[in-house]
Amino acid sequence: MKHLKTLLLPAIAAVAPFMISSCDPKPAKGTLLDNVPNILTNVVGDSILQTWVKDSISVTSDFGHVGIAMQHPVDTFSVTSQAITEYMSEMLGGKYDGSYTSPKAVMKYYHADLMSELKTEYEEVKRARGDDEVKMEWDVTFSKVADNSKFFTYKYTMYNYLGGAHGMSALLGVTFRKSDMRRMGWEIVRNYANDPFQELMRKGLREYFEVKSDDELKNMFLNPDHIYSLPLPECPPLFTDHGIMFVYNPYEIGPYAAGMPTFTIPYADIQPYLTTTAQKLIEKQ
């Protein structure tokens, strides 16, 4: 169980204890894996074609199910492919010490590791309950969000069930600058605590929760005082085709029943609050 807990998304470890006992209904079987297209072709850089494919491993045994799906470039020796394969390894525990030129090999390594850990957890739960009815599940998907000549954005979605009353789901992601594969974090936002920027965030959340006033919005928060100073999400900023996406995982600002509060601030609105580094990434976006 100790190793499995290390995989509950390092960036949201602070809220993981609450999320494990959440009331989120289990998604339809295979949702995370089946929604990943098999082949994607994009024009990147100066009309350079780059084709992405899907690899997946999905095994159901007597103790449960483990699935890993990943989109990556066909050219697995490319800088892009190696960067996202390394990211996948980090999100799944960071123990793989081989080459990142084979996404499939990394997937197989962590799939076998998860199967072993899940079997151990299953045996512990079975002994505690005195029956073998419980079935474990762990599904993760790595997929592309956006891709252009300056950056690409990659996300990690996860659902697991470890024998408790309910399952757990979460989402993380990262935007890479293509020139050097730098990962963008919230350091690219200036003066986020100032009210003009806070209002952009409140506006996005009002739309997500479908409320019209801040008085209504604060009732959606676990801490009503967040209406005065919203924290930035644990999920890094996700650069998309049209703006920067903000994703709050369960229990960051709202109850689990609120889902994952998500909104996108258009580049035209957020640009004044971005560092020069980020502004250069979104030129002509």
Regions found by a protein language model. Name each.
Residues K2-L9:
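Bacterial N-terminal signal peptides that target proteins for export
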Residues F18-S22:
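C-terminal motif of bacterial Sec signal peptides marking the signal peptidase cleavage site
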Residues L9-P17:
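Hydrophobic helical h-region of N-terminal Sec-dependent signal peptides
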Residues C23-Q285:
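Compositionally biased intrinsically disordered regions enriched in Thr/Gly
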